[in-house]
A protein has these predicted regions:
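Short, charged/polar micro-motifs that form catalytic or ligand-binding hotspots
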Residues: 6, 35, 39, 51, ...
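Flexible, glycine-rich surface segments
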Residues: 39, 46-48, 63, 152-157
């Protein structure tokens, strides 16, 4: 159930990260422009996803971090460090450690995350609905994501 709710967000996260990286590479040459653009992106992401993310359970949030790592190839710590700063990454790592979590932990498809990797394989192969039905005898609930790209206002900067 957690996977079904969270994986679509990780897939959208991958698309948005690629969009941000592409915009930075093509249109942002100065550090101040980059910082302004990243700040605008952050505001847009909060506007789009804050309600949904805050509505997730702790386990769903942890799974989302793992799946974002799988899709983007970066731990939550590395993403924060890359797009914000080392200071921000260290701050959030400290907060995570207070709750016995680690933003630096990586997705391990052959080890502790092998079961999650199998679920990703089933989803990506297009067999998710029948797999879900075989377990729960009902169709999987759909996660509705408002948008999969950043708005044009963010892209223009």
């Amino acid at each position: 159930q957690n996977f079904n709710k969270v994986y679509p967000y990780a897939l959208v996260g991958r698309k948005m990260m690629a969009q941000v990286d592409s915009t930075i590479a093509a249109d942002v040459s100065k550090r101040s422009q980059r910082n302004r653009y990243i700040n605008d992106v952050e505001k847009e992401l909060f506007r789009i996803f804050e309600k949904d993310i805050r509505g997730m359970t702790v386990n769903q949030g942890l799974l989302l971090m793992k799946l974002v790592d799988r899709e983007c190839g970066m731990s939550a710590y590395s993403i924060i460090k890359t797009y914000e700063s080392g200071f921000a990454a260290n701050f959030w790592q400290l907060v995570a450690r207070l709750f016995s979590q680690d933003l630096k932990s990586r997705y391990d498809p052959k080890g502790k995350d092998a079961k999650t990797e199998e679920l990703c394989r089933i989803w990506d192969s297009g067999e998710w609905d029948s797999f879900y039905w075989s377990i729960f005898m009902t169709s999987p609930p759909r996660t509705i994501i408002k948008t999969e790209t950043l708005s044009s206002e963010v892209k223009k900067r």
